[in-house]
UniProtKB/Swiss-Prot annotation:
Coiled coil: none annotated. Defense against chitin-containing fungal pathogens. It is an enzyme of class 3 (hydrolase). GO terms for molecular function: endochitinase activity. Its EC number is 3.2.1.14. GO terms for biological process: chitin catabolic process; defense response; polysaccharide catabolic process. This is Endochitinase 3. The keyword Hydrolase applies.
Amino acid sequence: MYDESTGYSSALK
C-alpha cells in the first residue's frame, strides 16, 4: 500500500 505521508510504499517500513 502507498503511504501518502511519506511518498513511499508502506512495505518499505
